[in-house]
């Protein structure tokens, strides 16, 4: 059946899960390496170092933390959408790519300190997660 064929291959939506898993590390890398102070000594306790940051570097780390919070929900939505089989693969792929785009925009908004816009982008991303469930019902 088409459902089993779809489960047996790495769809674009599945690749988006992989991207979502690694995307939060962009925040950590930005916070650590695009400013002064991070080196071998700071690497002994990187969480302590990150807790001392301020401004855009602190926001970059906060974006990372939010990425870790939302990724499990996105991964679950993609997996369940594939298993349910109620939606065309192209639609699942489009929703998953849109979610990744929303996460990149979220990171940019967080880094720039655009709180209200960041919140709207966050809601859009959560809506895309919900949409993955709804279209597959």
Language-model-detected regions and their locations in the chain:
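Hydrophobic residues within alpha-helical transmembrane segments
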Residues: 19-22, 97, 101, 120, ...
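Long, highly hydrophobic alpha-helical transmembrane signal-anchor segments
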Residues: 6-30
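Interfacial loop-to-transmembrane junctions
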Residues: 104-127
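Helix-coil boundary and interhelical linker segments in multi-pass alpha-helical membrane proteins
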Residues: 6-15, 79-94, 133-137
């Amino acid at each position: 059946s088409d459902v089993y064929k779809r489960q047996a291959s790495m769809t674009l939506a599945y690749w988006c899960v992989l991207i979502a898993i690694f995307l939060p590390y962009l925040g950590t890398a930005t916070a650590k390496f695009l400013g002064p102070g991070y080196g071998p000594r700071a690497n002994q306790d990187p969480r302590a170092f990150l807790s001392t940051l301020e401004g855009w570097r602190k926001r970059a780390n906060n974006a990372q933390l939010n990425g870790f919070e939302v990724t499990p929900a996105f991964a679950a939505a993609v997996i369940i959408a594939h298993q349910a089989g109620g939606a065309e693969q192209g639609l699942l792929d489009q929703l998953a790519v849109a979610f990744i785009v929303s996460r990149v925009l979220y990171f940019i908004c967080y880094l720039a300190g655009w709180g209200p816009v960041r919140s709207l982008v966050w809601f859009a991303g959560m809506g895309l997660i919900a949409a993955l469930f709804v279209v597959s019902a």
